[in-house]
């Protein structure tokens, strides 16, 4: 199917659900968002799709659950007006891996770039929300898929920069993919850290990215560690702001990570020019000995194989985090079936 023709059609049809999503926004902002969403939807319908559902608007634009009118295939269409959507399309056209979201096609409409993507049953965030706990083998199967995706990206000089539960799509624990490449950075020098700009999500970003220090592929390893922790605790958040932290910003987030980990001054990255070293090393006081279990492990009773993996991935110094390839060789993954069976079969 060719999705590459420009569409020149407009209408004013709109899901009423989006009004509920925007209930807390300023009235003028809501009106503008509704108008822009209606334009995106009109272009999608002109391109030969029927919109089934409008998802909550994101930073890059709008996402719709759709059905292709001729084939009756269920798809997801992302419609964005920012550079991240174009970047995502370019990256997805040039990569191919079983656990990375597949780009089925693209089209443009007015100022929108639209990506046609396969539809999965849910994302990992909602998957965890629907369950009180999941089996360790399921967690490790999902994490293995995420690490395989990250390994492939890093080998192709791409840093995802926004690995999180909301960007991991799942049909079942053996059918998982990493998506949403709007924050991705390429091409990168995987052998040398550099500041590629701010991107991602504060709650899941690595300390060096939060500090605006030079960074590299290890930022994805940190975020994947947060994902594994959330699976192990079934949605608990390790480094979310608490009642004492006020508004969540990078400075507060770094201090929260340092406090909850109990980072010893000797565990800071050895770089006199780095913000983490220059500003935060001197403010940290801890009785924890360097190289011992992080302070947060005292609050959770995690299986040792999961705790060990998470601690390795959440090393405060990026140079101490293993690569995705190295992590996949850890003993925790040895007994996980590959391919992982579909529990409904």
From Swiss-Prot:
Catalyzed reaction equations: L-seryl-[protein] + ATP = O-phospho-L-seryl-[protein] + ADP + H(+); L-threonyl-[protein] + ATP = O-phospho-L-threonyl-[protein] + ADP + H(+)
Protein kinase domain residues: 49-334
Signal peptide from the UniProt entry: none
Pfam name, any one: Pkinase
Post-translational modification as stated in the protein's UniProt record: Phosphorylated by UL13 homolog; this phosphorylation regulates subsequent phosphorylation of UL31 and UL34 homologs by US3. Autophosphorylated.
Organism for this UniProt entry: Cercopithecine herpesvirus 9 (strain DHV) (CeHV-9)
Chain residues that bind ATP: 55-63, 78
Catalytic residue positions: 162
Protein name: Serine/threonine-protein kinase US3 homolog
Alphabetized UniProt keyword annotations: ATP-binding, Host cytoplasm, Host nucleus, Host-virus interaction, Kinase, Modulation of host cell apoptosis by virus, Modulation of host chromatin by virus, Nucleotide-binding, Serine/threonine-protein kinase, Transferase
GO cellular component terms listed in the entry, alphabetical order: host cell cytoplasm; host cell nucleus
Primary role: Multifunctional serine/threonine kinase that plays a role in several processes including egress of virus particles from the nucleus, modulation of the actin cytoskeleton and inhibition of apoptosis. Phosphorylates UL31 and UL34 homologs, two critical regulators of capsid budding from nucleus to endoplasmic reticulum, thereby facilitating virion egress. Modulates and redistributes host components of the nuclear envelope, including LMNA, emerin/EMD and the nuclear matrix protein MATR3. Phosphorylates envelope glycoprotein B (gB), probably to direct it to the cell surface.
Protein family (similarity comment): Belongs to the protein kinase superfamily. Ser/Thr protein kinase family.
EC number: 2.7.11.1
Subcellular location: Host cytoplasm; Host nucleus
GO biological process, one term: symbiont-mediated perturbation of host chromatin organization
